[in-house]
Amino acid sequence: MNQDLVEEATAQIKSLDFSKSVVMFSGGKDSLVVMDIAKKAGLNKSVYINSELEFTISRRYVEQMKENYNIEDVIPKIDFFEFCRRICPPSKRLKWCCKVLKLALSMKHAIKTGNFYQLTGIRSDESDRRSKYEVINADPFINVNKRYRFFQVNPILYWSEEDVWDYIRENKLQYNPLYDRGVKRVGCWCCPYTTRSEWELARDLEGENFQKFKNIIKDFSRNLPANFRNRYNKKGWRSFATNYNKIEVLKMTNNKNSFVLEGKKEYLEKIEHLIFIVADRYKIEGSKLYFERNIELQRRQIRLVLEKPLNCVGCDVCTVICPVNALYLENESIKVDPTKCVGCLSCCKNINGKLKMGCIARNYKTERFCITF
């Protein structure tokens, strides 16, 4: 084992403020090495995002590792299968799963605990994209909340896979049993990027959940054109993408800064959850909602905010974007706390990157309720 690599990683970890740092343990070999080096350096604090998409073997392994390491589970409030029903099964082109079940959870945990320096097992030789990473990244993909800065720390960025295994063997670390089954990279068993052998392993090891996912794929295919259903059920779901079905439920008109939304009361009551963000004053009369705004705001920005509650699936992603924590979920529906909202409009500005304007439903649901103007 190259001890210089270990010393460099140790020094990097020791340079951090431990009160603001945490190891993001995935159950894989790379983050295992980081977690062990961090513990020896004095940082025995790890988080495992338990999305319940990992192999059962992996989750049991993480439980065993808690005997030697301080690992906290972070679990989504709504499970993967329910999100599949509310949004769609994930695919290579509709990758909502990582945003909802990984990224947003890690951001919420950082905001809650103050652990904004997240140590990972990322290595530069894993992909072309990761070869461009630095040891400490002010992650541009998750810096959408202007109040906080999130840092990704990669202590073993320049290690090779052989270096990782050498460290594990020399330190007699207990690694994930999945590697002994030929798995190259520990991850989600139902990932659309899985190889054929990994898919077969999932079928063998995750029998009940595997069948549940297959049934969800089959149920979803019933809404597709007849000539595509069979292909979708077999392998087509992996690369699936389609134009969404636009369901117009409200019509918006305006005269300068006076606006009228017209439609069924049930939809008006939903947008009432967020109307405070874009309106100085408002009232509902029958099938119409009247509101005024003194500061000029583009209609598409107003629509971006008000379509959130119309399509909300309870994913919690948009709440991590608000810099004053004014957005929250109640009964799995997005709402705003008027006592916290400062009118910064972060929730309706164009947010590039992984969180896609902070609304998973507006970007990935195949049927979306819309406001027209």
Where are these regions (language model features)?
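Nucleotide-activated chemistry modules centered on ATP-dependent adenylation/adenylyltransferase
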Residues: M1-Q301, V305-L306, C359-F373
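Short linker/helix segments within small regulatory modules
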Residues: D180-V183, Y328-K340
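Iron-sulfur cluster-binding cysteine motifs and their immediate structural context
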Residues: V317-S333, S346-I371
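Local cysteine-cluster metal-coordination motifs and their immediate loop/turn environment
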Residues: V100, K184-S197, L310-V324, T339-G353
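Long, compositionally biased, intrinsically disordered segments
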Residues: G286-S287, N311, S333
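Intrinsic-disorder/low-complexity linker and hinge segments
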Residues: I302-V305, C322, V336
